[in-house]
């Protein structure tokens, strides 16, 4: 039995695109930091090649053996322990960003444990939900009691990630995965809706507990309010309208970069907003930088590649006879989909920016390797299905 070649090729093409733009978009960053011109390119090339090899070697494992289960549980436990100890590591062993330690330094590279934790979490939920949730109809109270232990643990673990790493984006993704996979496992729509309500309430509490987040939400709403206020009654307009608002610097230049690229772009390597105007253009704002250079047409091609990859994973999931494999593949597809849209909507101000990487495109080894582990597992599972 062979793994699915289409998924492997689609993933490899996206990785290659990410490698190319790690060189093009980092032109100013390497000068500013005093690095060699090929610093980010060589590192991303190494991440990409090793990621493809990870996919290939994992795909050779038999998914019906205990090895798959042991590897995924080990990934979950090791990454979870790393997340716990990360805030207590000395500065020479941990890299900080946004006022919080998020990476563990291992020689010349830094590892973000939360990226690997998400993959382990998806497998654990697939395995555990299969044992606890079935397709039989139950009263909403019974379903809540089944899901309650997961919610309690999720609030504790995800809350710890949010507090210690100040990373709302990863927390939102993790909570979404827990709810969505419960639905895929057989939970009712009522339970899913109930979970969304609870998650929304928790989200509001988190946002309004921080003045900085209130200001970010206010700035975001101020940028898009003109599209919605005409549909609101006058009394509501008076309440929600933001009178004084300044467009965030990064979002402003992100939108300008996209507009400057037009339909066909300025040409590979010819973007100007990467030259100090738009920071983090090779990481969080990679889609804006790419669009400036290859235009909306080029961006559309990338979106189509992503869509084909995600649909392929869903197709593999739909053909799985093993329920654990079905839920796991669905979780990987949802992770890719949700991460892509969180970033894409954030850089054009449709949603608040959360600093979530674009899978396979954004510069960084942790995101690359974790996604390649997930894709390798899907490829491994694809050997057991008829496509």
Question: Which functions belong to the PLM regions below?
Answer:
Residues 2-6, 28-165, 344-357, 363, ...:
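Membrane-helix boundary/helix-loop-helix interface segments in multi-pass membrane proteins
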Residues 13-27, 55, 82-86, 127, ...:
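Alpha-helical transmembrane segments of multi-pass membrane proteins
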Residues 46-54, 292-313:
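Hydrophobic alpha-helical transmembrane segments
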Residues 71-77, 149-160, 168-208, 214, ...:
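Hydrophobic alpha-helical segments of polytopic membrane proteins
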Residues 103, 194-296:
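Hydrophobic, glycine- and aromatic-enriched re-entrant/interface helices and adjoining loop segments
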Residues 172, 177-191, 269-295, 356-369:
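Interfacial segments of multi-pass membrane proteins
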Residues 314-355:
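Loop-to-helix entry and N-terminal half of a specific, functionally important transmembrane alpha helix
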């Amino acid at each position: 039995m062979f793994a699915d070649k289409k998924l492997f090729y689609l993933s490899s093409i996206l990785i290659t695109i990410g490698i190319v733009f790690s060189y093009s978009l980092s032109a100013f960053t390497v000068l500013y930091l005093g690095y060699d011109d090929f610093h980010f390119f060589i590192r991303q090339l190494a991440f990409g090649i090793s990621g493809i090899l990870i996919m290939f070697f994992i795909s050779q494992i038999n998914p019906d053996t205990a090895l798959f289960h042991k590897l995924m549980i080990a990934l979950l436990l090791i990454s979870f322990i790393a997340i716990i100890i990360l805030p207590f590591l000395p500065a020479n062993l941990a890299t900080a960003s946004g006022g919080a330690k998020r990476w563990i330094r291992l020689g010349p590279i830094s590892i973000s444990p939360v990226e690997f934790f998400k993959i382990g979490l998806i497998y654990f939920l697939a395995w555990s939900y299969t044992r606890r949730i079935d397709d039989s109809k139950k009263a909403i109270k019974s379903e809540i009691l089944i899901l309650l232990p997961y919610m309690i643990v999720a609030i504790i673990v995800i809350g710890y990630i949010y507090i210690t790493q100040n990373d709302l984006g990863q927390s939102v993704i993790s909570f979404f995965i827990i709810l969505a996979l419960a639905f895929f496992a057989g939970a009712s729509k009522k339970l899913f809706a109930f979970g969304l309500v609870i998650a929304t309430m928790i989200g509001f509490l988190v946002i309004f507990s921080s003045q900085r987040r209130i200001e970010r939400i206010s700035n975001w709403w101020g940028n898009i309010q003109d599209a919605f206020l005409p549909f609101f009654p006058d009394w509501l307009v008076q309440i929600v309208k933001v009178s004084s608002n300044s467009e965030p610097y990064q979002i402003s230049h992100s939108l300008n970069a996209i507009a400057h690229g037009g339909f066909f772009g300025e040409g590979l390597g010819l973007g100007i907003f990467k030259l100090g105007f738009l920071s983090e253009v090779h990481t969080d704002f990679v889609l804006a930088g790419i669009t400036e250079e290859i235009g909306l047409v080029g961006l559309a091609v990338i979106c189509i590649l992503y869509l084909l990859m995600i649909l392929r994973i869903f197709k593999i999931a739909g053909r799985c006879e093993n329920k654990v494999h079905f839920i796991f593949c669905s979780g990987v597809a949802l992770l890719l989909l949700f991460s892509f849209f969180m970033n894409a909507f954030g850089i054009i101000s449709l949603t608040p920016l959360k600093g979530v990487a674009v899978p396979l495109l954004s510069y960084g080894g942790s995101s690359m390797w974790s996604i390649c582990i997930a894709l390798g597992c899907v490829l491994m599972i694809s050997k057991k299905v008829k496509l």
